[in-house]
Amino acid sequence: MRRRTATRRPAKKAPLGPMQTYLVEGLTHEAKGVARLNGKVTFIEGALPGETVTAQVNKPGRRFDEAVLNAVIETSVDRVSPACQHFGDCGGCSFQHLEESAQRLAKADWLAGQLRNLLSKEQIECLFDVGSGYRRRARIAIDHKKNALVLGFRSKASNRVVDVEQCHVLTPSLQTLFVSLKVCLKQHPILSSLGHIELLEDTKGLSVVLRLVSNITPVQQQAYLDWAQQQDVELYWQAPKASRADLTDEQMRYYDVSNLRLKYHPQDFIQINEFMNQKMVAQAMAWLAPQKDDTVLDLFCGVGNFSLPLAQLAGSVIGVELQESMVQAGRHNASLNGLKNLSFVAADLTQPVAGQFSAENINKILLDPPRAGAFEFLDTIIHIAPQQILYVSCNASTLARDAEYLVLNGYKVVRAGLMDMFPQTSHVETMMLLQKQK
């Protein structure tokens, strides 16, 4: 007998609580106002510190409530009108309603809280640059459930695609390219065959990656090749089920940093903020201060964003990266820039590999791990026993965890800094220098 499958009903939304008046005292790193009512913490999206607001609880909890903003009775002097018409719906930006200097102060406060066991807020140095038009890479989502053309970014509250007309954090050239691409997609519909789209701007120019989930006709393909030629854009296709397209050296992308040229595959990771990347690399060189008698290990090195600048100054540099394709790109970049003191190794940095570098006399380490941090590799670092460790992180909470472990094992924090790599968003990049204690 065939068993009948029960129909899953969507969860009912909790009814809104009564309208309440709140005095907002603080701000979370996700840009939610922090208030208290009868001693219980309430997080209010869209409310700013110093404001008196009315709001209704929509997600009650045992330890705290979440509420939706109804009205602002007394407005903060730091509140500004968002530049983007999609702010509040699009999940990309969370701080556009807060004046830029106040954004930076809020991020510094949050970072100080994360690192409170290691140093004081006054010790945190800050790097900032432009607050808009900085993003040189964007992944565009497609809504396949609608007949109309819906391209943009995911909603803040769901996986729904917000139909974006303009994005203020994209570079001006990418904004123009996005508008032109939408016109082309309307004229030559291939949405049912598209998984998603990536836009890129680098030293080489503009490019578009179209990731296909099914094949398109030669006529359709030619229409996009013609469009790309008219727009002076390099077009890349990723075929259905293909993980990575093989490219010739001429087809590879490239960007410049520290007077060096780095080639990379369009699917490789690069920092999305060119201005801040230049500043970040320069600061890393200044803090770590590599000399000709230094041997530096660059962990999670990618295609050599830090490795190549290090090799200009140090006696020897070893870059370590999991992906073999990026290791090959790093080697090519070293050769391209004439750096004979730089080598690259493919290794899984979640596994002990200390013996691999035991004969190298490594005295300095730079690491730039993913959001999960580098906890599995810390014992290997401690075994190598470098005099200095420069830790670059996109997740301050895992940085704090890893740094506290290093401090327990003979290191001290010398410097720490916030780098506002992602203005208007809740994300920050952090740099920390640790010194081995004698």
Swiss-Prot record:
Biological processes annotated in GO: rRNA base methylation
Domain TRAM: 13-71
Enzyme class label: transferase
Binding sites annotated in the UniProt record for S-adenosyl-L-methionine: 271, 300, 305, 321, 348, 368
Pfam families: TRAM, tRNA_U5-meth_tr
Organism: Marinomonas posidonica (strain CECT 7376 / NCIMB 14433 / IVIA-Po-181)
This protein's record includes keyword Phosphoprotein: no
HAMAP family linked to this entry: 23SrRNA_methyltr_RlmD (MF_01010)
Active-site residues, Swiss-Prot/TrEMBL: 394
EC number(s) per entry: 2.1.1.190
Name listed for the protein in its UniProt record: 23S rRNA (uracil(1939)-C(5))-methyltransferase RlmD
GO molecular function terms noted in the UniProt entry: 4 iron, 4 sulfur cluster binding; iron ion binding; RNA binding; rRNA (uridine-C5-)-methyltransferase activity
Binding site for [4Fe-4S] cluster: 84, 90, 93, 167
Job description of the protein: Catalyzes the formation of 5-methyl-uridine at position 1939 (m5U1939) in 23S rRNA.
Alphabetical keyword list: 4Fe-4S, Iron, Iron-sulfur, Metal-binding, Methyltransferase, rRNA processing, S-adenosyl-L-methionine, Transferase
Family the UniProt entry places it in: Belongs to the class I-like SAM-binding methyltransferase superfamily. RNA M5U methyltransferase family. RlmD subfamily.
Catalytic activity: uridine(1939) in 23S rRNA + S-adenosyl-L-methionine = 5-methyluridine(1939) in 23S rRNA + S-adenosyl-L-homocysteine + H(+)
